[in-house]
Amino acid sequence: MSKKLHIKTWGCQMNEYDSSKMADLLGEYQGYTLTEEAEEADILLLNTCSIREKAQEKVFHQLGRWKTLKDKNPDLIIGVGGCVASQEGKAIKDRAQCVDIIFGPQTLHRLPEMIEQVRRGEKAVIDVSFPEIEKFDRLPEPRAEGPTAFVSIMEGCSKYCSFCVVPYTRGEEVSRPSDDIILEIAQLAEQGVREVNLLGQNVNAYRGATHDGGICTFAELLRYVAAIDGIDRIRFTTSHPIEFTQDIIDVYEDTPELVSFLHLPVQSGSDRILTAMKRGHMAIEYKSIIRRLRKARPDIQISSDFIIGFPGETQEDFADTMKLIEDVAFDHSFSFIYSARPGTPAADLPDDVDMEEKKQRLAILQDRITQQAMRYSRHMMGTVQRILVEGPSVKNPMELRGRTENNRVVNFEGLPKHIGTFVDVEIVDVYTNSLRGKFIRGEDEMDLRRNLRPSDILAKHKQDDDLGVTQFKP
């Protein structure tokens, strides 16, 4: 009888990535297979997120439900990982006696070892340290699950925004070596992956070591990934405006594999609130980035994050945010009502914005962005869009689902053979959260792949130095 593993994941795409690596790790080294049913599992893992309000209590409520399973099966192993584990490891140990393992985002690679410690009789094995990049060195080879894949290129954040727990739960910025990332993506491409999403808490701060002792910038990494055979689309998340340098913008100008969609969190349009948040930039600097981006890639769509009701936010501050939303014409947003995160500088500020006022501002903001998104979607009516077919439609399994470059889901009637490939569809209807398409042509009619000589690729970024020696600059 095979051993079963159940993982419950809360939070960001980085957590989703980490959970997939936990499953791969325990599957390869200890033979565990995933199950959707906690009642069937031999190991229960909770991968937590500390961004939202009452994150700690949410963890204890879940552990209370799992405790009933452990009461029935004393051999059941329960582990808690992620950012809440990193921040509240001792509290979890003290309050939840049913928990056997507590591990942080940077120590998930030690799971097999920690499980063995529990089996040898040790209680509450805890490791929430920050051993830099060691985590990636000890994970199994990547395994593709469809035509898209997430690849973590760096961890942590060193910006210390006043409201954010990430530097305290995931540590400061640490970048993976560029060769390791390129190898992982090449392996995924061999398995049929066509689109990669590069992950990091502050992904454009990437500074990875190269094989010759140099440093690879994020802009250089994007071009290296674009050169990998089989990779036709590149996305990345999440970025910080102060790291969005001109060399990254230049990649949008000459690298078609980089999609015409960017998620660039701004949090507020008020300079006063941005200063209180310790964001390190003003609203006009953010707009300057967008202006230069749209010069390089005129059709790019922009999404962002907003925090509503930050301590001291006045009606005038909120009006500044709404003005920024209008000026930038955001296409999508992740918007949240502010709630203090324990241990952050902002937690010491008086939460002086009335909750009803916060809710009203949030509704106004979301309504405006929904209107702008629908306007963009209506402009797509009658156009032909190239989409990567990800699988069956969620609402109708007899149809297919794909995604446009600007991150819109399109449902259409198509054949199973199109899954994992690009197709062209005509947009025939528009909905709030998706588009309706009509199949036009498949990948075999697109002439997507062209045979290129090495000299053609090198010529793309060829430069001559002062001595007339030709060099390749990625």
From Swiss-Prot:
Co-factor: note: Binds 2 [4Fe-4S] clusters. One cluster is coordinated with 3 cysteines and an exchangeable S-adenosyl-L-methionine.
Binding-site list for [4Fe-4S] cluster 2: 157, 161, 164
Cofactor needs: [4Fe-4S] cluster
InterPro entries: Elp3/MiaA/NifB-like_rSAM (IPR006638), Methylthiotransferase (IPR005839), Methylthiotransferase_CS (IPR020612), Methylthiotransferase_N (IPR013848), Methylthiotransferase_N_sf (IPR038135), MiaB_methiolase (IPR006463), rSAM (IPR007197), rSAM_horseshoe (IPR023404)
Main location per the UniProt record: cytoplasm
Biological process (GO), any one: tRNA methylthiolation
Top-rank lineage group of the source organism: Bacteria
Localisation per UniProt entry: Cytoplasm
Domain MTTase N-terminal: 3-120
Keyword hit for Iron: yes
GO cellular component term, pick one: cytosol
Summary of the function given for this chain in its UniProt record: Catalyzes the methylthiolation of N6-(dimethylallyl)adenosine (i(6)A), leading to the formation of 2-methylthio-N6-(dimethylallyl)adenosine (ms(2)i(6)A) at position 37 in tRNAs that read codons beginning with uridine.
Subunit structure comment from the entry: Monomer.
This protein's name: tRNA-2-methylthio-N(6)-dimethylallyladenosine synthase
Organism: Shewanella oneidensis (strain ATCC 700550 / JCM 31522 / CIP 106686 / LMG 19005 / NCIMB 14063 / MR-1)
Classification of source organism: Bacteria, Pseudomonadati, Pseudomonadota, Gammaproteobacteria, Alteromonadales
